[in-house]
Amino acid sequence: MTIVNVNDANFEQEVLRSELPVLIDFYADWCQPCKQLAPVIDSVAKKLEGKLKVAKIDVDRSPMVAQSFRVQSIPMLVVIHQGQLVGHQLG
């Protein structure tokens, strides 16, 4: 199971240029609901390894990416495929 830590610097390479669809988990270390969601994200990463890339983005450390997705509450999940937004879910 591989979960990639993505930030403002590597977002384009890890997400937009990914050949696989990417599930992005926008989170923050202080966010309790994010901590509760973490085991589910880990499970998805394990079950779909090789079919889906899972990326975690700390909104406090990557404000440019968070702002570009208009993240106003977390956790927020986003799916990107071939550089395009496919879907998103809050909470």
Across the structure, where does each feature detected by a protein language model lie?
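A short beta-strand-turn-helix
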Residues: 3-22, 63
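Short pre-active-site segment immediately N-terminal to redox-active cysteine/selenocysteine motifs
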Residues: 19, 27-30, 73
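Hydrophobic beta-strand anchors of alpha/beta hydrolase catalytic cores
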Residues: 23-24, 54, 77
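The canonical Cys-X-X-Cys-His
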Residues: 31-34, 77
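Typically the conserved alpha-helix immediately C-terminal to a functionally engaged Cys/Sec
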Residues: 33-49
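Structural microenvironment flanking redox-active thiols in thiol-disulfide oxidoreductases
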Residues: 57-66
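Non-catalytic, surface beta->alpha helical segment in thiol-disulfide oxidoreductase systems
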Residues: 72-91
